[in-house]
């Protein structure tokens, strides 16, 4: 059985790790390289580094920061934010990233997904989907871009299926409604996407306790759980989380 993954997320703005609630009210959570090293040493399976201001400010993710971070860790590393060309993807992979995450640029230019998948292999291409539940709808979500500031009107489930057809290797699915709240993942959203694609789905947005993480693997059918506030605030450690999940007989890589 393929091991389930725990993935700390480093949201970066202006060179610092930040975290907010529902994509707003950002607060400083530390230096990205220091946090990357800490989580790598503590037993993270992978890392995700997202420059959350890049798409808004129309600038590329800082390759230097990616390089310094990647050189400091020994685990797979995904980088995203403002990546809008095959050349940019090449630069980031050469700088040390194992994968790249495409979001706004994939919606704007779907051909970028297929081109980059052919060029670098679909294992390198992660599609990030920022999903928000439609008002008064229990099972319909829309895709947001530009750091969660712009509603595309695109149905999340349709888009997930489309990016799979285009050649994506993985989906990073964020519930904007749950982001930073620590009230639990959106299990209905996660399961709905996981059920219609044959791709690993990384669940993001809302982890607040050990049971939330267990639930997103069992009920949400996620292949990986993204963790941010829970770890940055030191509410739980990766060792505590992994010990809990291993006791529940889930296929998790133990901390060394």
Swiss-Prot record:
Record-listed E.C. numbers: 4.3.2.10
Pfam families reported for this sequence: His_biosynth (PF00977)
Keywords: Amino-acid biosynthesis, Cytoplasm, Histidine biosynthesis, Lyase
Location relative to the cell: Cytoplasm
CDD domains: HisF
GO BP annotation list: L-histidine biosynthetic process
Record-stated family: Belongs to the HisA/HisF family.
Function of the protein: IGPS catalyzes the conversion of PRFAR and glutamine to IGP, AICAR and glutamate. The HisF subunit catalyzes the cyclization activity that produces IGP and AICAR from PRFAR using the ammonia provided by the HisH subunit.
Name by which UniProt lists this protein: Imidazole glycerol phosphate synthase subunit HisF
């Amino acid at each position: 059985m393929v091991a389930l993954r725990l993935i700390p997320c480093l949201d970066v703005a202006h060179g610092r790790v930040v975290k907010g609630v529902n994509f707003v009210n950002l607060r400083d959570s530390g230096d990205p390289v220091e946090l990357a090293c800490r989580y790598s040493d503590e037993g993270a399976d992978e890392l995700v580094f997202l420059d959350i201001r890049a798409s808004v400010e129309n600038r590329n993710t800082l390759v230097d920061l990616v390089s310094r971070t990647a050189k400091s860790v020994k685990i797979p590393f995904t980088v995203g934010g403002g990546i809008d060309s095959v050349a940019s993807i090449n630069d980031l992979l050469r700088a040390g990233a194992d994968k790249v995450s495409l979001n706004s640029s994939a919606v704007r230019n779907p051909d970028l997904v297929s081109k980059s998948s052919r060029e670098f292999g679909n294992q390198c291409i992660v599609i990030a989907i920022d999903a928000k539940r439609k008002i008064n709808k229990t099972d319909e979500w829309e895709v947001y871009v530009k750091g969660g500031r712009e509603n595309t009107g695109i149905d999340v489930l349709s888009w997930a299926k489309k990016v799979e057809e285009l050649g994506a290797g993985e989906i990073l699915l964020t519930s904007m409604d749950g982001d930073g709240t620590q009230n639990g993942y959106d299990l209905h959203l996660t399961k709905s996407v996981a059920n219609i694609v044959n791709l690993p789905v990384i669940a993001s947005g809302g982890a607040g306790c050990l049971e939330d993480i267990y639930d997103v693997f069992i009920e949400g059918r996620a292949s990986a759980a993204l963790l941010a506030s829970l770890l940055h605030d030191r509410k739980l450690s990766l060792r505590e989380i992994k010990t809990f999940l291993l006791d529940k007989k889930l296929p998790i890589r133990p901390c060394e």
